[in-house]
Amino acid sequence: MSDTPTRKTDLRVIIVGGSVAGLTLAHCLANANIDHIVLEKRAEISPQEGAFLGIWPNGGRIFDQLGVYADLEKCTVPIHKMRVRFPDGVSFSSELPRQVQERFGYPIISLDRQKVLEILYNRYPAKSNIHVNKKVTEIRQTEREAQVLTADGAVYKGDLVVGADGIHSAVRAEMWRQAKDLVGRRDRQDVNHEIAAFTVEYACVFGISSPISGLESGEHVNSYSNGLCVITFHGKDGRVFWFILIKLQKRFIYPFTPRFSASDAAKICAEYANVPVWGDICVRDLWGNKTSVSMTALEEGLLETWRFKRVVLLGDSIHKMTPNIGQGANTAAEDAGVLASLLQRLSTSDSSATSCTIDAVLQEYASLRYERVKSTYQRAYFGARLHTRDDALKAFVGRYIFPRFRQQVLERTSQAIAGAPQVDFLPTPKRTGPGWSDYAGSPEVGAPTLPWLVISLPVLASMLCYLVYSSVFVTPIFP
């Protein structure tokens, strides 16, 4: 743990969810000497689900502050080259990943979600604070405290409840239930609108495969087709992390969304077995070398209400996007860093943890995060549709416009990375690059004028599409 100012205000935080978001927040609070527990509904913290994460410099710097980045980096190799293939067989390569590392000191890395959770758990200093098999059934709030009830009959009391329990968040459901009970009919309609904010238009097959000749470690491939895309990342010892994004025939509204099984994944990969990935490699090769695979519906949505009294959300429970831009773990880390910084400031102040002071902290957290997350979410939303060539304009820009403006993309990307938050009360890591200072003072990173490039071409092309829409590069662009 780091040396922090003396705590004056006793705080107890209940984190629901042993996710990347939840464990990152737990690390932050441990460093701030803030009392906390983690409640995880599953029997283990790091199950193998066939999923993987991309970590960019904005997330990497926070993980470095927490002392876990070196362990993450040992498990993989940095991405140094990006390769892109279009349906007509035309392809090109980009050095953008290497250039980003040179500017910011951290590479782009990709590794198993299971391994990230395992490292976060193993490096956590107070494992007795983490409780598994704790399914939340109810949250109660009073003027003085919040109470979390679990299926085994236990009751946990604290000053604040944090929902880091993912898209199917029990904390979010309880927050909505309480809000509906306390508001009038008109406001209740607003709550119902929030409940329906998550939608599904895409499904995704996630897989990890043993080495495939022609897919080199440290490289990343984007293969675009009409209605689907195949994206691969090649890690340590040639392991291949991949996903296939498929546009569904109809739009679903959460929670009435489709569920998929391993047999569904097999059918999809059989149907698209001949879709090219890179060179002579096709989807059949990814499937033939698979070591794990899963298929899921991809929820998309960003809620406007992040808190209610002593309850607050972070990570996928509040903002959910497709994996094309690889920003989920990075955004969750930013959420955790900002919330922990505000709680640390409260804990070292002369204020007590009253309902008013807690509400002020949570309001500031939502205010600081919303615009940046909104910008990221919109680019992910557009990127998925660009990747799958959702219409003629996206197909044209991705194919003919994007490759010509790589330097502009790198500059805008650098501005966005440089504006990322970190954990305020922890030292900035010595490992760094000139980009953090060279691009400091750029427009507010959460503003819609700043594009956000994360793990692959989708975001690059998304930005260029918006540049085309705005006619010239010097005018503000949206998302």
From Swiss-Prot:
Uppermost EC category: oxidoreductase
A GO biological process held by the record: austinol biosynthetic process
InterPro entries for this protein: FAD-bd, FAD/NAD-bd_sf, FAD_mOase_fung
Keyword Transport: no
A GO MF term: monooxygenase activity
Swiss-Prot/TrEMBL cofactor(s): FAD
Membrane topology, record value: Single-pass membrane protein
Compartment list: Membrane
Pfam family, one: FAD_binding_3
UniProt keyword terms in alphabetical order: FAD, Flavoprotein, Glycoprotein, Membrane, Monooxygenase, Oxidoreductase, Transmembrane, Transmembrane helix
Annotated glycan sites: N289
Coiled-coil intervals, chain numbering: none
Pathways involved: Secondary metabolite biosynthesis; terpenoid biosynthesis
Enzyme Commission designation: 1.-.-.-
Binding site for FAD: E40, G54, R113, D316, A329
Cleaved signal peptide residues: none
This protein's record includes keyword Protease: no
Transmembrane segments: 449-469
Active site positions, chain numbering: Y224
GO cellular component, one term: membrane
Primary role: FAD-dependent monooxygenase; part of the gene cluster B that mediates the biosynthesis of austinol and dehydroaustinol, two fungal meroterpenoids. The first step of the pathway is the synthesis of 3,5-dimethylorsellinic acid by the polyketide synthase ausA. 3,5-dimethylorsellinic acid is then prenylated by the polyprenyl transferase ausN. Further epoxidation by the FAD-dependent monooxygenase ausM and cyclization by the probable terpene cyclase ausL lead to the formation of protoaustinoid A.
Note: In A.calidoustus, the austinoid gene cluster lies on a contiguous DNA region, while clusters from E.nidulans and P.brasilianum are split in their respective genomes. Genetic rearrangements provoked variability among the clusters and E.nidulans produces the least number of austionoid derivatives with the end products austinol and dehydroaustinol, while P.brasilianum can produce until acetoxydehydroaustin, and A.calidoustus produces the highest number of identified derivatives.
Protein name in the entry: FAD-dependent monooxygenase ausM
